[in-house]
Amino acid sequence: MTSYRKITSNIAGKLSLLETYLFYCLALCSDCYTMESYIKQDNLTNIYGIKKTDQIREWLHKFESLGLISIDKSDIYGQYGKFNRCSYQLDTEHYVLITNKLYDEPISKELKGFLILLKCKCLNGTNTTLYSQNRLAEELGLAKGLSLIHI
């Protein structure tokens, strides 16, 4: 298992901080080479740290509508009847590498989401960005003048 996950830089400006963190959690639950995941929404809810499966489902469909993931539903027949199984294929075109260690950092989900979005706007393979704070806020879809103190 690799210690990094590919996150498409196309999320910048399209997702909120919390949605970005969910996208990262989904990437953590995906195969590190194919970026395909078979995680159940209940399990993803537990990993994300909320109790609202409906919120997770809503965000997953938003990701799909933005072309960030594709969702494939298939019917599974088992001992207890029929149920749906979803698989998620994450887009990795124009990606950045995000360490798996970020998940365990003792910081808020919002700050983790911000750091992921910030990395999406860095120069290839670096932690350097040439944007001003206001321009960066525009690019990421955040309020101008947003600082880490507010997160």
Report the location of each language-model feature:
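Short coil turns linking two alpha-helices in DNA-binding domains
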Residues: K51-K52, A143-L146
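Conserved small/polar residues in nucleotide/adenosyl-binding loops
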Residues: I149-I151
